[in-house]
Swiss-Prot record:
HAMAP family: UPF0102. It comes from Chloroherpeton thalassium (strain ATCC 35110 / GB-78). GO terms for molecular function: nucleic acid binding. This is UPF0102 protein Ctha_1382. Pfam families: UPF0102.
Length: 129
């Protein structure tokens, strides 16, 4: 497996575990719609969240959340619309979240685990009316 792909999967695994601890149910991972993909689709109470996960080793190229550009948002919106059409639900609200992770594997904590920072941005962006 490509090292970037493996690193991204590790970030998605961390985000999934983090969201579960926060009370979210993971409905789908890596939902594909055409060329677009949603990393995680979660649910808590009556909210279904489409979650984009961005993981970086450090801040040399900016904060991971900055990588969720307008064009990426449009791709996520298209995929989410297809998911909603294929999985209609009554009484459910939808939103887009971002989990940004900085995972510095060169630094270790007291348990000899890589140092990590997880940033959870609820309702990170909205669709246009």
């Amino acid at each position: 497996m490509n090292t970037n792909v493996a690193f991204g999967k590790k970030g998605e695994d961390m985000a999934s575990a983090f969201l579960k601890k926060c009370g979210y149910q993971i409905l789908r991972r890596n939902y594909r719609s055409g060329n677009n993909e949603i990393d995680l689709i979660t649910k808590k109470d009556n909210i279904v969240a489409f979650v984009e996960v961005k993981t970086r080793h450090n801040l040399n190229y900016g904060h991971p959340a900055e990588a969720v550009t307008l064009s990426k948002q449009k791709e996520l919106i298209k995929a989410a619309q297809n998911f909603i059409n294929d999985n209609p639900s009554q009484g459910v609200d939808y939103r887009f979240d971002v989990v940004a992770i900085i995972l510095d594997e060169s630094k270790r904590n007291a348990f000899n685990e890589p140092c990590e920072d997880i940033f959870f941005i609820e309702d990170a962006f909205r669709t246009l009316p």
